[in-house]
Regions:
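Short active-site neighborhood of thiol/selenol oxidoreductases, capturing the structured segment around
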Residues: 9-13
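Local cysteine-cluster metal-coordination motifs and their immediate loop/turn environment
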Residues: 14-27
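C-terminal scaffold of the Radical SAM
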Residues: 4-6, 27-53, 59-307
Length: 307
């Protein structure tokens, strides 16, 4: 017999300033402008379609995650528009977690304040490294100084729940360099660190032109020393790459790992729903290309799969 799990919402923003050579996410480099208003309206249409699939409209949203791409390219008004309308259909839980991913190379203090004012209460900054040498190897558009500034701007905007994405095992990275990245990250007093091992994925530039990676022994040494440092500074590991202070675990990610339900809206977004009245699970998958997503009826373009 199926049980009703917690409900989350994933919103995908597909555009980015520059496609990184290691990125295998559904992201599309901006060439000139992009249709933010049209896309935002389509997200709401998409939400209404998913709402009809939901069945029980009395379920509360426990978390929202805005990923990409680079969601911080969008205005705060766009998210205020969405949240206001979504709230008219689904109740937000009293302690809802609303996360936005942001690129340190696309930081705007007014925009960050607008995100906070719109109800976003958690920000995830894609720092990846505090060493300009490695940032250059990764094709990132920001510098170490930009990364530190983005953290300061987020705090000034009102964010207390801040996640830093940091990679380790970068091309030709030493144990000392990886540990130094963590040390600087911890100095910034984030509430959460996502410490990922760098991997080369198919359909990326690095897959066709692979850089030289650290040996297995070095990578093992990085992980051993890194996890020890994080533990020393009261970061509790609750998933292989996730470390939180003061019970600031990401509810949204935990809901994924716990086989919870999530509505997925936006180009390339995936969703999973438990339909108790039909005793079945369904998965949804939206068109990856933004133009195809915006120019077709959402319901007819959505792929459905029962599991």
């Amino acid at each position: 017999m199926l049980e009703q799990p917690p409900l989350s919402l994933y919103i995908h923003i597909p555009w980015c300033i520059k496609k990184c050579p290691y990125c295998d996410f559904n992201s599309h480099q901006v060439n000139g402008s992009f249709e933010e208003d049209k896309y935002t309206n389509k997200l709401y249409d998409d939400f209404l379609v998913e709402l009809n699939r939901l069945g029980d409209k009395n379920r509360e949203l426990q978390s929202i995650f805005i990923g990409g791409g680079t969601p911080s390219l969008f205005k705060g008004d766009s998210f205020h528009f969405l949240f206001t309308r979504i709230k008219s259909h689904l109740k937000f839980s009293g302690n809802i977690e609303i996360t936005i991913e942001a690129n340190p190379g696309a930081v705007d203090s007014e925009k960050f304040r607008a995100y906070f004012d719109a109800g976003i209460n958690r920000i995830s900054l894609g720092v990846q490294s505090f060493d300009d040498k490695y940032l250059s190897k990764l094709g990132r558009i920001h510098t170490s100084d930009d990364a530190i500034k983005s953290i300061e701007v987020a705090k000034s905007a009102g964010f207390e729940n801040i996640n830093l994405d940091i990679m380790h095992g970068l091309p030709e990275q030493s144990i000392e360099a990886a540990v130094e990245d963590l040390r600087i990250a911890i100095e910034q007093s984030p509430s959460h660190i996502s410490w990922y091992q760098f991997t080369i994925e198919p359909n990326t530039y690095f897959y066709n032109y692979p850089p030289k990676l650290p040996s297995e022994n070095i990578q093992d040494g990085i992980f051993e020393k890194g996890t020890k440092i994080l533990s020393t500074h009261a970061f509790s590991q609750y998933e292989v790459s996730a470390f939180a202070q003061n019970s600031r675990k990401s509810f949204h990610n935990h809901n994924y790992w716990s086989f919870g339900d999530y509505l997925g809206i936006g180009s390339g977004a995936h969703g999973k729903l438990t339909l108790l009245n039909e005793n079945k699970l369904i998965r949804t998958n939206k068109p990856k290309r933004p133009d195809h997503y915006m120019n077709h009826a959402v319901d007819s373009a959505t792929q459905l799969r029962e599991i």
